C-alpha cells in the first residue's frame, strides 16, 4: 500500500506545475523541478518569464516538489536512476551532489563556471558541488547554522552574546534564575532523530577541533556530552528537544519562550515579521565554540544541476547561468530572504539597506563547512542518527554513542571503499 501511494505521488508531482501554459508546440520546453520555497515564491516565476523573453523559442515549466528534502531526494532518485528523468533542471541539497554525480545522474558543469568565477561564490558550496575534481552543480542560495538570542533579555541582565559554549550555559542559567519564568527555556536546538540532529551535533563537535566520524575521540565525546548536559545537567534545554525540529524550535523561540536557539537564517524574516511577539527583540550571532577553537557552522543551501541525459542540456545550462547571476540572486534575496551564494552581493549597500542581517551572515557563510563530502553521506548520517538520538534521550553515554557511530562508518568504509572525505578543520 505504501509503495502504491508513493508511486501515485511521484506520478502526480508533475501536475504541480507553473508556467508554460499554452506553449508553442515548436518551442523548447524546459521542466524545472525544485522544492516549494518559503514565503512568496513568485519571484522565481517572474525570473523564469524574464528568461523566456531573453531566450525566444524556449519556455520554462516550473514544477514544485514538497518542501521536505527527504521526499525530494526520493523523487529525484526514482526518476534519475532510469536515465529518462521528466525534467531538465533540478535544485539539489548540498549533501546530494556527490551521490548524484557518482551515480552518473547529473552532468558536469566545469565549462559553465570557470575557476575564476567559482571564486566569486562562498567556498563551502563549491566544495560540496565538486566530485572527482569536476563541478556538477552551481550554488543557488546558501545557508549555515546560526545562533539566535533574545537581545532584550541579554541587555536587561548586562550579558553579551556568548562566544563559547560554557558562556552560553552561564548566560542561560543567570537569566533563567533571575526571570523565574517556568515557560522560558534557555537553549533550544534540533534534537529529533533526523538530519537536523546531525547538523547540531557536528557544529558542537567540530567547534572543539575534531569531527563526529574521525579525529580526536576525547574532544568528540566532550562535544556529544555537552548536548546531553544542556538537558540533564544544566537544565537549559527542554526534555521535548528529543522531538524538536527547525519549525518547532522556531515557534518556541518566536513565542518568546526561549533565550537562545540554534537554527538556520530562514527564521530571521519570520521572527521579525509584523505581529511576531519577538519582533525587534532578537539578535543573530555566530554559533559558539569551545575555548581555543573556531565556530563551525554546518553548510546548508541548494544548488542547480542538469540531468545527464536531458536532451535540452544547453538550454538548461543557460537557465542555470541566469538564475545564479548576481541580479537573480539579489532579487531572490530581497523578495523571499534567501541568501545569495555570490560573495560580492554582501558588500552592496543597496542590498544591505534592505537586508542588513546579511552583514552578520557574511562571516558565518565564509566559515561554513560542508558535511562529509562523499557520495555515501546519507548512509553515514542515517546510521548515526539513531545513535545520537539515543544520547539525547539518555539511553547511551557519549562514549557509547561515538563508538557506535564510528563503528558504522568503518563498516561502510569496508563495504564501499574509503567512502568519505572530511571538510577541512
What are these regions (language model features)?
Residues 97-99, 264-279:
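A ligand-binding cleft/hinge motif common to bilobed small-molecule-binding domains
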Residues 50, 56-121, 128-130, 152, ...:
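Extracytoplasmic "Venus flytrap"/periplasmic binding protein-like
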Residues 49, 77, 156-157, 228-237, ...:
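Extracytoplasmic/periplasmic substrate-recognition and gating elements
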Residues 93-144, 169, 185-186, 197-200, ...:
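Hinge/lid segment of periplasmic solute-binding proteins
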Residues 172-174, 212-242, 287:
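Glycine-centered hinge/linker elements that transmit conformational signals in sensory
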Residues 136-140, 145, 169-214, 258:
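Extracytoplasmic/periplasmic solute-binding protein
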Residues 128, 282-285, 334-386, 390, ...:
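Long, aromatic- and glycine/proline-rich binding clefts that accommodate carbohydrate-like moieties
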Residues 5, 11-98, 161, 291, ...:
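Conserved N-terminal structural module of periplasmic/extracytoplasmic solute-binding proteins
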Amino acid at each position: 500500500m505504501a509503495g502504491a501511494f508513493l508511486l501515485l505521488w511521484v506520478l502526480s508531482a508533475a501536475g504541480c506545475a507553473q508556467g508554460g501554459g499554452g506553449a508553442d508546440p515548436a518551442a523548447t520546453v524546459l521542466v524545472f523541478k525544485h522544492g516549494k520555497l518559503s514565503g512568496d515564491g513568485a519571484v522565481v516565476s517572474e525570473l523564469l518569464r524574464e528568461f523566456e523573453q531573453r531566450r525566444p523559442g524556449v519556455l520554462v515549466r516550473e514544477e514544485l516538489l514538497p518542501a521536505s528534502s527527504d521526499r525530494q531526494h526520493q523523487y529525484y532518485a526514482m526518476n534519475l536512476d532510469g536515465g529518462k528523468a521528466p525534467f531538465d533542471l533540478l535544485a539539489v541539497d548540498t549533501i546530494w551532489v556527490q551521490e548524484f554525480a557518482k551515480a552518473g545522474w547529473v552532468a558536469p558543469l566545469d565549462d559553465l563556471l570557470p575557476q575564476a568565477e567559482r571564486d566569486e561564490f562562498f567556498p563551502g558550496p563549491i566544495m560540496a558541488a565538486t566530485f572527482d575534481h569536476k563541478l556538477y552543480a552551481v550554488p543557488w542560495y546558501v545557508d549555515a547554522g546560526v545562533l539566535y538570542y533574545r537581545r532584550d533579555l541579554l541587555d536587561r541582565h548586562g550579558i553579551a552574546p556568548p562566544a563559547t559554549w560554557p558562556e552560553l550555559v552561564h548566560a542561560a542559567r543567570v537569566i533563567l534564575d533571575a526571570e523565574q519564568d517556568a515557560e522560558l527555556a534557555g537553549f533550544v536546538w534540533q534534537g529529533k532523530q533526523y538530519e537536523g540532529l546531525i547538523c547540531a551535533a557536528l557544529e558542537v563537535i567540530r567547534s572543539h577541533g575534531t569531527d563526529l566520524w574521525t579525529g580526536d575521540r576525547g574532544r568528540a565525546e566532550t562535544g556529544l556530552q555537552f548536548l546531553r548536559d544542556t538537558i540533564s545537567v544544566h537544565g537549559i534545554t527542554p526534555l521535548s528537544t528529543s522531538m524538536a525540529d527547525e519549525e518547532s524550535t522556531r515557534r518556541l523561540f518566536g513565542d518568546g519562550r526561549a533565550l537562545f536557539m540554534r537554527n538556520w537564517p530562514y527564521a530571521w524574516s519570520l521572527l521579525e515579521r509584523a505581529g511576531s511577539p519577538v519582533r525587534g527583540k532578537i539578535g543573530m550571532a555566530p554559533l559558539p565554540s569551545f575555548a581555543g577553537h573556531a565556530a563551525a557552522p554546518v553548510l546548508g543551501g541548494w544548488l542547480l544541476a542538469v540531468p545527464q541525459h536531458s536532451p535540452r542540456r544547453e538550454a538548461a545550462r543557460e537557465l542555470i547561468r541566469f538564475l545564479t547571476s548576481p541580479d537573480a540572486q539579489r532579487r531572490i534575496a530581497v523578495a523571499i530572504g534567501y541568501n545569495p551564494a555570490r560573495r560580492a552581493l554582501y558588500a552592496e549597500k543597496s542590498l544591505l539597506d534592505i537586508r542588513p542581517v546579511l552583514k552578520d551572515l557574511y562571516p558565518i557563510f565564509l566559515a561554513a563547512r560542508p558535511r562529509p563530502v562523499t557520495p555515501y553521506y546519507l548512509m553515514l548520517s542515517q546510521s548515526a542518527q539513531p545513535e545520537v538520538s539515543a544520547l539525547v534521550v539518555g539511553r547511551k553515554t557519549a562514549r557509547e554513542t561515538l563508538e557506535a557511530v564510528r563503528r558504522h562508518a568503518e563498516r561502510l568504509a569496508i563495504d564501499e571503499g574509503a567512502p568519505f572525505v572530511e571538510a577541512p578543520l
